[in-house]
Swiss-Prot record:
Species: Crocosphaera subtropica (strain ATCC 51142 / BH68)
Keywords: Ribonucleoprotein, Ribosomal protein
GO molecular function per UniProt: RNA binding; structural constituent of ribosome
Protein name: Small ribosomal subunit protein uS9
GO cellular component: cytosolic small ribosomal subunit
Alphabetical list of InterPro entries matching this protein: Ribosomal_Su5_D2-typ_SF (IPR020568), Ribosomal_uS9 (IPR000754), Ribosomal_uS9_bac/plastid (IPR023035), Ribosomal_uS9_CS (IPR020574), Ribsml_uS5_D2-typ_fold_subgr (IPR014721)
Length: 137
C-alpha cells in the first residue's frame, strides 16, 4: 500500500475567561476568519464592530490579522464577556505560537485577565450592597 502524505495544519490553543464567560480558542493558519460556535463572528456578535475589533486586537498588534483563522467555542456570560474572553484566548494562543510574541502583547494589556466579576448578594440587603431604606422614626 502506498503511503499518503498527511499535511496536518498546526493548531494553537488558548483559553480565555471574563466574568462567567469561557472561550476555548484555536488559531489555525488561514485568511483571518472568525468562527464562534460554528457561526461567523459578525453574525454571532450581532454585527457589533467593537467586539470583532477587540478580538482582532492581539493579531493586529503583531501584524498577523490575515494569517490565522480564529475558531472559538464560547459559553457562559453575555456577548461582552464572551468577546473579552475570546480576546484573552487569542492572545494566549499567540504566546503559544511563538514566545517572542509575549512582550508586545503584555505591553498592550492583552494578557491581563480582568478580575472583575459580579459581587454576591448578602443577606439582610436587597442586592450586594443596597441596604433597605432607613427610617429614623
Amino acid at each position: 500500500m502506498q503511503a499518503t502524505e498527511n499535511k496536518e495544519k498546526v493548531v494553537y490553543w488558548g483559553t480565555g475567561r471574563r466574568k462567567s464567560a469561557v472561550a476555548r480558542v484555536r488559531l489555525v493558519p488561514g485568511s483571518g476568519e472568525i468562527i464562534v460556535n460554528k457561526k461567523p463572528g459578525n453574525i454571532y456578535f450581532n454585527r457589533i464592530p467593537d467586539y470583532l475589533q477587540a478580538i482582532k486586537g492581539p493579531l493586529e498588534t503583531l501584524g498577523l490579522e490575515n494569517d490565522y483563522d480564529i475558531l472559538v467555542n464560547a459559553h457562559g456570560g453575555g456577548l461582552t464577556g464572551q468577546a473579552d474572553a475570546v480576546k484573552l484566548g487569542v492572545a494566549r494562543a499567540l504566546c503559544e505560537l511563538a514566545p517572542e510574541n509575549r512582550p508586545p502583547l503584555k505591553a498592550e494589556g492583552y494578557l491581563t485577565r480582568d478580575p472583575r466579576a459580579k459581587e454576591r448578594k448578602k443577606y439582610g440587603l436587597h442586592k450586594a450592597r443596597k441596604a433597605p431604606q432607613y427610617s429614623k422614626r
